């Protein structure tokens, strides 16, 4: 079966967008609310009709992720950010560990269902502070025990703040969700060695169409 770089690139852009948000929260203490919301909302899309449907069917919802893919895969306009590279490699590794752990996957699904049930209490706003705190707790309880912790670099003033810690963990959880999607559509780590150009070309095409 032919490798589906269309869907692989969408899913990888989801991972890259999530880890770019992590970096922004850690270094700047903030990130674009709409971009953050696009990543967080993907956590509640459990039965999508297509890969893009996870991100509400809009490539524009992955703009930051597509920019990051281009920079990471060697676009002449982008410079390699090794910090971001370390984050997405670790997120993909953790998502692969999750995929091989049926108990953890079941626990994650159960906790996300709880989030959905709680939404009406917060006027269906997944971005409510308590919702972000609950998503962060899922990352700590379900994902962190799967493997070595992702060491996030940034300004200490931000990293010690509980609200920033929660946004970082919620972003990482969105990255894990995209990492699971990446595996489901045929993503493998070998592709980053042998098919970087194909992923880059696809990301460039997507970006031009936004």
UniProtKB/Swiss-Prot annotation:
Coiled-coil annotated spans: 103-130
Assigned protein family: Belongs to the HflD family.
Superkingdom of origin organism: Bacteria
UniProt-recorded name of the protein: High frequency lysogenization protein HflD homolog
Membrane protein topology class: Peripheral membrane protein
Any matching Pfam family: DUF489
Keyword Membrane: yes
Species assigned in the record: Actinobacillus pleuropneumoniae serotype 5b (strain L20)
Keywords: Cell inner membrane, Cell membrane, Coiled coil, Cytoplasm, Membrane
Location of the protein in the cell: Cytoplasm; Cell inner membrane
NCBIfam families: PRK00218.1-2, PRK00218.1-4
An annotated GO cellular component: plasma membrane
